[in-house]
Amino acid sequence: MDKPIIILGSGGHAKVVADTLKLLGKQVLGFVTNNNDSLKKILDINILGDDSILDKYSNIDVDLANGIGSIPYDATRWDVAKRMRNKDFRFPSFIHPTAFVSSDVSLDEGVQIMAGATIQTGTSIGMDTIINTAVAIDHDCSIGKNCHLAPGTVCSGGVSIKRGVHVGTGSVIIQNITIGKDTNIAAGSTLYKDVKSNITLFKN
């Protein structure tokens, strides 16, 4: 039986996560946020308080969903997930009902697959990675943990993306390309050759 879910964060990505979970029929208990805003509800779901409220919950009773957005040069999303896992909370993966995910695709914990995404056969997606709106990933790709493929990204077959990579909106990655870890790809890029680790690639 599915546990109720508490969403971390209260920004735009948290709204999308909440909307997706509602479409999937999940019970969302509320949001936790450290932002000092005046909001009391988002999508008619209560803001429960800051993350200290989680001390009142057990990992036996609730699961978490990471609603903290992923942007380049900001590890907040991944740091918070690590801290909550150290308290034994679990982050289930979820797939938007309009996404297509081939039956043999491997998803690690905490993967978020958003509306209209396509993930083809032979592909694996690492822990806590966001496959955002209308992303297309073709056959036999490997996407590492803590990645964000922003809306409209296209990966041809055999692409390998290492951990911690941010691929900007509308980028296109040609077949069999490898992107090294902790690299940021600017929106609208087209990649024809491998990209090294720990760099920022501006639009070419």
Model-based region annotation:
Residues 1-51, 55-58:
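Hydrophobic, well-ordered beta-alpha structural blocks that scaffold small-molecule cofactor pockets
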Residues 35-36, 70, 189:
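Glycine-rich beta-alpha junction loops
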Residues 9, 68, 175:
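Small/polar loops that bind or transfer phosphate-bearing groups
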Residues 39-96, 100:
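Phosphate-bearing ligand-interacting subdomains
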Residues 93-203:
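Structural signal for interior beta-strand "rungs" in well-ordered beta-sheet cores
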Residues 12, 72-75, 106:
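Short alpha-helical
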